[in-house]
Amino acid sequence: MSTIYDHAGSLRRMGNDPELFHEMVELLRTDAPTLLSAVQSADREGDPPRLQRAAHTLKGLSANFGAERAVAAAGEVERLAKARQSGGLPAAITELEESLDELIAALAPSPQMSGSS
């Protein structure tokens, strides 16, 4: 089983700056739900360019963490939107939702990190 994200690789990509890492985690936590909502509404409204842009942004956010499953899922949504192949979108969007939920949960601070007693 592969890991959900690559912590060491993420830190390297962020200049070994733990503060930047935590800022990027917060960015993902705040932006991913908004972008996922944009993916869902663009799909419902039949707006492939908007769907493609939102999926592309989610792919980039996920790539910051080396989250292969989320990157692949966002890439598939982006590819389907670009090709205007709506038939595979429901399953691809579900996979994207699940992989982002998994990533965000994996990035949640542990009790030791949060400073709780």
Residue spans for each PLM region:
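Two-component system phosphorelay core
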Residues: 1-117
